[in-house]
C-alpha cells in the first residue's frame, strides 16, 4: 500500500445523520449565493513555497516526529527568525513576548546539536526560578522523547544538594543537558560536583531577571568562567532594557539580535483564524461570498457527515465552483483518485469530512473553512492545520450557528490560548494570508 493510501485508508467517525447542506436561498444568481458565474478557476494563482516550516530547518527525524506529536506544524515568528541562526552556532540575543515560542528555539536547536558523551554536560541552561527550570526540563523531555540516549537534569535550590552530587558522580546518570538556577549550579561547580569543561552551548532564559540582580549576576559570571571560552551563547527574554543589553553582550561574540514586535500575536500554527456567526440557512450564502471574495491557492471545506459532503459538493459544482468530495462514503480506489486529483492541483476546492483532517500534506492549501464546526479542539487542530502547511501563510474560517458551536470555539481558544475574532465585515487583505 502506498503512503497516500496509508493516509486515507480508514473510516472517519462521522455522524450518520440525514442532514444535507443548507439549500440555496434561490437560484437567481445574485451575489452572495451559490450561483453560476462564480468560477473559482479564475481566482488567485499558485504561489511558491518560500517561507519556513519545521521540516525546512533540517532537524533530526526524531525531533520532527516529536514536534508532530505536539501538533505543531508551523514555526512562530520568533522560531522562524532564530532557529536558523541558532543552528549555525552563532551567539543570539532574542526578545519576544511570553508565549511566542522562545523556549522551543533553544530546546530544539540544542537537541539538534548535542552529541551525548557519558559523564559530560554539553548544554547548560539557566533561568531565575525553580518553576521555570522545571518547565524547561519538561520541554526537553517532550521534544527528546525519541532520543533515548539524551539525558536531561534539573537542579535548583530548596532540595538536598547531596542528591544532586550523587546524580552527577555517576556517569550513567550524569545529564548531557543541565537546566538550573544560578545559585544551585554555582554551588555545584564550587564544590566540584559539576564540571563544565565540555559545555558547548550556554543559554540564559529570562536573562534580564538574572543579570539585573547583582547576586544572581555574580553567580552567572562564576558559572560562565567555568565553561570553555569557545562556545555558543544564547540569551532570551520577554523584556530587555537598554541598560541590560550591553551586559548581555559582554558574554557574547558578535551576537545576532532578534526583536520580535511587541504586537505580534501567537496564533495556532501561524494561521489567521476567524469565525462567522450565522444561521444554518445562511451558510451557503456566506460560503459563496468567501469563495468569491478571498484569494486562495486551494481550499478545503469541512463538513460533519458524508451526506453533507456529497450534497455540498454537488451544489458547488452546479453553481460553477468545480470541487471534489473526499470522505469514507466513496470506495477506497475512488477516494485515492480524488485525493491525487486535488493534490496535483487539478481541482482547487475540496469538500471533506474529518477523514481528510489528519496527516494530509498538500502544499497549496492555504484556506480552510469549517462549514460545520468540529466536535472538539483536537479535531479543529487537525482540520485547520491543512491550511498553510510547509510554513506557508494560511487562513481558517469557522461557521458558528448554535450554542454547541460556541462552546467548541471557546474550548479551542482556551486549549490553544489563541483568541479567534469574528470575521471582519470589510474582509481581509489578501497579502496577510497569501505568501509573497
Swiss-Prot record:
Gene3D superfamilies: P-loop containing nucleotide triphosphate hydrolases
Pfam entry (one): Helicase_C
Motif (Q motif): 52-80
Main enzyme class: hydrolase
InterPro entries: DEAD/DEAH_box_helicase_dom (IPR011545), Helicase_ATP-bd (IPR014001), Helicase_C-like (IPR001650), P-loop_NTPase (IPR027417), RNA_helicase_DEAD_Q_motif (IPR014014)
Sample GO molecular function, one term: RNA binding
Helicase ATP-binding domain residues: 83-258
Key words of the record: ATP-binding, Helicase, Hydrolase, mRNA processing, mRNA splicing, mRNA transport, Nucleotide-binding, Nucleus, RNA-binding, Spliceosome, Transport
Functional note: ATP-binding RNA helicase involved in transcription elongation and required for the export of mRNA out of the nucleus. SUB2 also plays a role in pre-mRNA splicing and spliceosome assembly. May be involved in rDNA and telomeric silencing, and maintenance of genome integrity.
PANTHER family associated with the record: ATP-DEPENDENT RNA HELICASE DBP3
Stated name of the protein: ATP-dependent RNA helicase SUB2
Source organism per UniProt: Pyricularia oryzae (strain 70-15 / ATCC MYA-4617 / FGSC 8958)
